[in-house]
Structures are given as structure tokens and as C-alpha cells.
Amino acid sequence: MADGTHPLGVDVVNQATGSTPRPYRRCVLTLLRRPLREADATSTFYVLTAVAALAFALCFTLNLVFQYRVVGLDPFQMVLVGTVLEATCFLFEVPTGLVADLHSRRVSVIIGFFLIGVGFAVEGIVATFAAAVIGNVIWGIGYTFTSGALQAWITDEVGEENVSRVFTRETQVDLTFSIVGTLAAGALGLVGLRAPVIAAGATMMLLAVGLWAVMPERHFHPTPRGDRETFGHLKDQLVAGLRIARGRQVVRVFLLVSLLVGLASEVFDRLWRVRVLDTFAMPALFGGDEAIAFTVFALIGTLVSLAASLASGRWLPRRVIDTNPGLPVALSALVQVVGVVGVALLGNLWLALACVWLRSAAMAFSAPIESTWLNRNLDGSTRATVLSMNSQANAIGQVAGGPPLGALATRTSIPVALVVAAVVQAPTVLAFLRVRRTAGATSSVSASVPVE
């Protein structure tokens, strides 16, 4: 062009003067920012939710079976892959968030889904330990591009007053297509255990291309400097969270519990399938096929957890949640510990699976109660800080606890590592019971003192 500017708004070299052009680093962002044909934001959100849920279920239903049977990872390597993923998400949350804060939520989401797809594809196609690590780093970085950006994008597009309805519908869409994806994973698993992982990667990359073509962004405004996530902000959150925890016992307990659960959970989540594969033959009902068996196991687990979540919200008396939440939460924590021990020690396949499902059900049952309990003890000015710190405590626990317990599983046995994990998590039961006793004593002394 005559003025030395590219039609997309990027400076080109001025041949007459030989001056240095502006770098082309904005070119990709500019291309991604403009859809070919804008679609309705709400419809786009539901479609991407459906496709992403389908792809995640495709990948994860048989992913750990694939890592063990096809890639040949030992218990330590399997846990290490998960730890690398957690560490990647933790470290890249802030730098990748700058794209959504400064440039475009749409661009951040598109980049994120594409990288997730690339990570899945690398792991599935190459099928080595190094590829599993690299693939999880890539898709972990991709996840941080979507984390927060997707919710912020749809909130910007439909408005805060309408977004609650959209999120409710999103949950239903996500559950439905997760079940569809689980069934599809089982079908593809009959072809080969790597097939659903590769298919998930291709689906995610196609989703990113589709979003580039139609995803609208009409209401984006850069986040003010003071509201952006930075490492300095994380440090401030840590200091503020610790200050709040010193003054409120219930906050201290939740931070401790999140850390302990993180320390114990990674080894169970990554190795219970290996324990089942090493110890038991697959039922003749499924033709002895591992892909079919673990697909059915996953579906049963999903339905059991859904039922437990509904039971928590609809059947548990409200007065229990309001006046004595520590009791059901402590019982749920106890059930989780018992479930881990059961998987480690029981010699019957269906009893071991029942322990897996019981643990998942206990987590689903207690999650809304814990959320209500913690939020009730926070004011608006500190809620986001404490909730973020609570999540970070769990992530730190997973990164710190996963490798040692994985190494223990490799050097001794998986049952030994699971029992140790249960011992690590056991104090959470006492912690919740202690809060309950303290709260009861406090309320009996003076009604004017807030009951935790």
C-alpha cells in the first residue's frame, strides 16, 4: 500500500528509506481476532462446550490404560507425567493469561484449544515416555490459555445478568457430551488404545479452526493494569490469604485439607487403573476386553458421582449444611480414605471398583457443602483471594506428593503407595471434626459470635 501499511494493519518494510519495519508478532493475533463469519455467541459457546467435552472424554477415558499398556510407563513415570501437567498449568497460568487480558479472549481460547489438540496428538502418535511428557506440557499450556478466558469471553458477550442461565445450560451440555465421548472412546479403543487419544487431538484442532471461522468477540475491553494476574499479584494473594487464615480457623483447615488431598490424590488418580490391570482379569461379560471394561467402569463412575452430587443438593437437610456442615464433610473425607485403602487391599475386582466409585461419590457429595461452608466464612473482599489460594494449595500438594509416592509404588508396590496416600489424607477427617467441635462450643457460649 502507498502508506507502507499492510491491509491487516501490520507495518511493512519501507523500501525507499530502508527503515526497520515493526515486528510481525501482531500478525497472527490480528488474523485470529477476525472471524470469517460471526455466529451467535451463546450458540457458539454451547457448541464448543459440547465438542470440547466430547474430545476430553475421548482422550481421558482410556488414556491411563494407553500409557500403561501401549507406552509402557511404570508407576513412577505415570505419576511424573501427571505432576508435569500440574506444574505446567501452575507455572503458565499467569503468562498465558496476559493474552486474554491484553489482546483478546477469543484469540486466547483458539490458541488454547489448538495446543490442547496438538498435545493429545503428540502423545497418541509418538507413544513414548518423552512424548507423553512433552504432550502434557503442550496441552497443559493450552489449557491455561482457555482457563478463565472462556468464562470471561461468554460473560462479556451475553452480559453478567444473563450468564448464570448460560452456565447452567453449559453444565448439562458438558455432562451429555462427556457420556457420548466416553462411549466413543470405548468404540475406538476396540481399534487400538491410541486411537481415541489421536481422535481427541484431531477434534480439538478442528474445534480451534472452527472457532477461528465463526467465534465472535464484540465486547472485549483490555483488563485494567491493577486487575491483571501477575506473579506479583500471586505473591500478594499468598500474603493476604495467610493473613486471613491466621484469623479464621475454618480457612486454615481448608488450606490444610487442600494440601493433604493434593499430596495424596495424584498417586491414586494415576495408579488405581494400573492396580486393577495388574491384579484382576477383565470380566467375561465384556469379553475380557480392557477398552470395553474401562469404558463401562467410567460410565458407572460418572453416574454414581452425579447421583451423589444430586443427593447432596436435594436430599441433605438444609439445616445440616447451615448449622453442622463439619459432620457430613468429615464423613465424606473418611469414606474417601476408606476407598483408597479398599482399592489397595481388596482382592475382588468388583469390591475394588466399588471403592473407586465410593471415593468419587464422596468427593461429589461433599464438594457443594465444602464450597458453601467456605464461602459463608469469607466476605466479598477476600473471597477470590482465599479460593485461589485454596486451589493453589491443592496444586502444590499434587506436585510435591506425586513423585515420591510414584517412586514408592515403583520400588515397592502400588498397594503400599496407596496405603501411604490414605495415611497422608487421614488427618483431613480429624481436621473437619475439630472445626465442628470448636464451632459447637463457640455457638453455645455466645450467639453473637460467628459460627464457623
Regions found by a protein language model. Give the residues of each.
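Juxtamembrane intracellular "pre-TM" segments in multi-pass secondary transporters
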Residues: 21-39, 216-255, 451-452
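Helix-loop boundary and gating motifs at the non-cytosolic
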Residues: 29-90, 250-298
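Transmembrane alpha-helix termini and helix-breaking/packing motifs in multi-pass membrane transporters
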Residues: 69, 179-200, 274-285, 313-314, ...
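C-terminal ends and interior cores of transmembrane alpha-helices
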Residues: 114-127, 334-347
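Cytoplasmic helix-loop-helix junction between adjacent transmembrane helices
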Residues: 135-175
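Symmetry-related core transmembrane helices of the 12-TM Major Facilitator Superfamily/SLC fold
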Residues: 195-213, 416-434
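Helix-loop junctions on the cytosolic side of multi-pass membrane transporters
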Residues: 200, 208-227, 434-444
